[in-house]
Amino acid sequence: MTELTSAMDIDVDEIQPRKPINKGKDVVGFGPPPQSKATPWVEKYRPQSLDDVAAHRDIIDTIDRLTNENKLPHLLLYGPPGTGKTSTILAVARKLYGPKYRNMILELNASDDRGIDVVRQQIQDFASTQSFSLGKSSVKLVLLDEADAMTKDAQFALRRVIEKYTKSTRFALIGNHVNKIIPALQSRCTRFRFAPLDGVHMSQRLKHVIEAERLVVSDCGLAALVRLSNGDMRKALNILQSTHMASKEITEEESKQITEEDVYLCTGNPLPKDIEQISHWLLNKPFDECYKDVSEIKTRKGLAIVDIVKEITLFIFKIKMPSAVRVQLINDLADIEYRLSFGCNDKLQLGAIISTFTHARSIIVGAAK
């Protein structure tokens, strides 16, 4: 007869650490960042402690205080991608468990494993065992990344697991859309919203990486990185690394200066000067000439119509025109962007853009008479 082992008799040191299932967010080891050239900068410069997390100091200080007082509740961190949610939880794990934190956390990506079976098996098995590897009974941590992608049945099952194993386990739920998480789970967690990073904090962190990698980036290039990332630090670091690799001259020991144009060309976004030129044509040239010129610059620089529409919409706010005309332009451009999202013909939609501006021009001229 097989001898059964109680969950309390299991030593976590004897359990093989689980391989985290995530979206490329590999857990960085305790200590200084790895120095391998092949390491993505997103992982190489991931914050190792709560003090290293950029921005959100009020949230970080609150979590730090709860950790110091041994009063850490279940957490629900939500907000746009690249704002430091996962990095914050991993920093908390390092602070709580030190070098043995891998044995004390279960990291799952709910986009990959989001069914009810994961909650009933993997999560419940991990939560039901108690660890004495740190010399005393200590709570463990379950990190559910992209929890908003879990099915409703899995979320209801998770609610019961959280209630049952609160004494031995803390749960940290991470998601982009809090409205996709059932109210029963939200009420069992302390919620923190991570807003997009502002330009000041992003610039400071990017300058740190630029200095560490010994890059040369112009002020305009840095501003372009901040603008294109829209508060997403992960996106900013990926763009910086891609631009560095694309602009690096193999014949020289040092990379050339990264400019605004390098950043825009690497990402495929239209340059601000190109948008100004296109807007000038739309507001001044006849239909046939404007169509020819915009088509030519679109083909020559490999621009996408949807990117042109987005940038022109932002540019409209900088132009002095009657409010009624501005409202009509934005409404028409929104319809064009909607049609483009369904794969409508680019040439037809380019004609629609020019027609929209031609009609707006006629209204402005008529009002001036």
Swiss-Prot record:
In this chain, the stretch annotated as Disordered covers 21-40
Q: After gene disruption, what is the outcome?
A: Moderately dwarfed plants with small organs due to reduced cell proliferation rate. Enhanced resistance to pathogens.
CC terms in the record's Gene Ontology section? nucleus
Q: Which residues bind ATP?
A: G79, P80, P81, G82, T83, G84, K85, T86
| Keywords assigned | ATP-binding, DNA replication, DNA-binding, Nucleotide-binding, Nucleus, Plant defense
The record's section on InterPro entries has: AAA+_ATPase, ATPase_AAA_core, DNA_pol3_clamp-load_cplx_C, DNA_Rep/Repair_Clamp_Loader, P-loop_NTPase, Rep_factorC_C, RFC_lid
Q: Name one GO biological process term.
A: defense response
**Where would you say this protein principally sits, based on its record?**
nucleus
Q: What does the protein in this record do?
A: Functions in cell replication and proliferation. May be involved in chromatin assembly and remodeling. Plays a role in the negative control of pathogenesis-related gene expression and systemic acquired resistance (SAR).
Task: List the protein's name.
Answer: Replication factor C subunit 5
